[in-house]
């Protein structure tokens, strides 16, 4: 049996300042980016290390930083909830592939209102973040919630202060349901929110929302559960009001056509389906097609392969949606393009890549 390499991979939400020196070591596989996927990446890495002796240092610093770090070769892989377009990937010499799916949940801090009780539409949510709806008992909200005791209280929008894939997923959804959002704000990992308070990472937004009466924020669903925040019920494309759940995310994933997505560039917001959660997204890994460190590249791809297979159950337990088998096959076929500095393939098929 292969003796595991003495890799030092510690999964932690470390500061950006620590990235530079850590990447100098040749004995590490380093990743950085999405806080959206941090709960499942942390669990995967912990479990993978226990079974293989191989560790992974993933730093949850936000998708924007993750993209910058992989482009500057400070890390071995970046993770972003906003995919890069094929042209941008080609210029940088990168490839991307989805690693897990989840949902962005608008969450509120309103006394007496629990998970799923408050109903919102996409256009109303957009108007809240545009600063056009400022009170919780505003007519646009009251009409959606007859009988719900809505307070005459100011709405405090909480948003991301850093470049964020979670923001990208939310903004992409809002641009699809609100012309005002599309024209005034647009879609990016960092947008100019006209109102509200900024928090760093999903943890920061969850924290501000928990501490601020009358607040509304948006976080990955696992953070909403962990922080015991009340998610809203959101109207989907089919006109149904649904709450965030693994099953609702799965419905969105089932409607995505990955075979027709160049460089796996696919967005999952506002998909059809009665049970579909409308703010669903994927986290994408970004890696170089030509790898400078062969052994590191091999171990990195083995980790992702393991996450698709043995890690699927862990993703499910954390309310994420694991990768469908047909998509895994497409992804691992694309890995044939990953080579070392000498042009030799870095990926071995699962039948020969034992874990």
Which ranges hold each PLM region?
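N-terminal secretory signal peptides that target proteins for export/translocation
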Residues: 1-5
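Bacterial N-terminal signal peptides
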Residues: 6-20
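Flexible loop/hinge segments at secondary-structure junctions
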Residues: 24-355
